[in-house]
């Protein structure tokens, strides 16, 4: 319809958000050109943006359309997590390890898993796996077996959702003392939550911070 419209465009954390207007007139074709201002170049300083918690299914490793989505957000490393429960897994990935990575123009998508995940012990995340590892139903609460297998494969493992949602603090208390946990996802949904991270640091445990969107489930309003 004829009128004045507001245009808003963004591209990740290194570009300023563009805001402008465009007038649409009757009987005319209106073209608009947007130019995003980059205010910092973190890769040139050795820092690369990433999202450790995405749920997106792909049928093939080199999924150009999916790669385009995350590249538009300027996410250099996107970890696509196969999501499990006691019965099955969802968002299954086509390949694992090096074969499960698709790198183009400095932006990569890779396979990982969020499994095991329960409301009794929290949700766990495992990156850089050579193959997925899903516990049988009668051992599903034995989280330590997945952490140990992840490390045997050269993986990196931790707890999602601030280490608090879905009773993740219970899992942290059980697994951190045995040096099984590499990180806690403390930044999500626009919130930084550290109350289940600092106590372990104060006790002398090495526990890295992580950030993940949990797309498409979490958002700034949650």
Give the location of each predicted region.
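A short, solvent-exposed beta-strand micro-motif common in secreted/extracellular proteins
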Residues: 2-12, 70
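Surface-exposed coil/turn segments at beta-strand junctions on protein surfaces, enriched
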Residues: 1-2, 25
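Catalytic cores of extracellular degradative/oxidative enzymes
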Residues: 45-220
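Extracellular beta-sheet/turn segments enriched in Thr/Pro/Gly and aliphatic residues
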Residues: 22-42
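Short acidic/polar mixed-charge low-complexity motifs
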Residues: 14-16, 28, 205
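Solvent-exposed coil/turn segments that connect beta secondary-structure elements
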Residues: 12-14, 39
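Edge beta-strands of extracellular beta-sandwich domains
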Residues: 16-23, 209
